[in-house]
């Protein structure tokens, strides 16, 4: 913990070690889902191949998720390195759908996003329809 005096204002900084994980299998995905449900929060952000969403070449590459400050995880989707990081048999569409059904469509989990309009377009493309509150 650090105290910083700037002019007449005193700021408190807490050094926080972050914990970030790449989800590699269904067991880890279930743990991520349990964390989101336990805290009641899921801050989600998609990364893509930067193609327009309605182009056939559009691909979501990663879904990053945080359930509390300092903790986060990436769900590998249609990324060129997905097979290097995930267990054999990883089906990113099924894993995305599972996360969507249990977290995004869960009324009791508050969704937090920076660009929800875009992220929700991706969700809808994969038949995930958010329920509850989104900030």
For each predicted feature, which ranges?
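Conserved RNase H-like, two-metal-ion catalytic cores of nucleic-acid enzymes
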Residues: 13-135
């Amino acid at each position: 913990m650090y105290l910083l005096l700037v002019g007449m204002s005193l700021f408190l900084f807490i050094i926080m070690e972050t914990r970030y994980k790449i989800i590699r299998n269904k067991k880890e995905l279930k743990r991520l889902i349990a964390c989101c449900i336990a805290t009641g929060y899921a801050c989600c952000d998609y990364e893509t191949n930067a193609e327009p969403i309605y182009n056939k070449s559009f691909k979501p590459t990663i879904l990053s998720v945080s359930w509390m400050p300092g903790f986060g995880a990436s769900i590998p989707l249609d990324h060129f390195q997905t097979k290097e990081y995930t267990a054999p048999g990883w089906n990113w569409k099924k894993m995305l759908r599972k996360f969507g059904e249990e977290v995004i469509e869960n009324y009791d989990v508050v969704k937090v996003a920076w660009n929800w309009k875009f992220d929700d377009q991706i969700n809808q493309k994969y038949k995930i329809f958010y329920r509850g509150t989104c900030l």
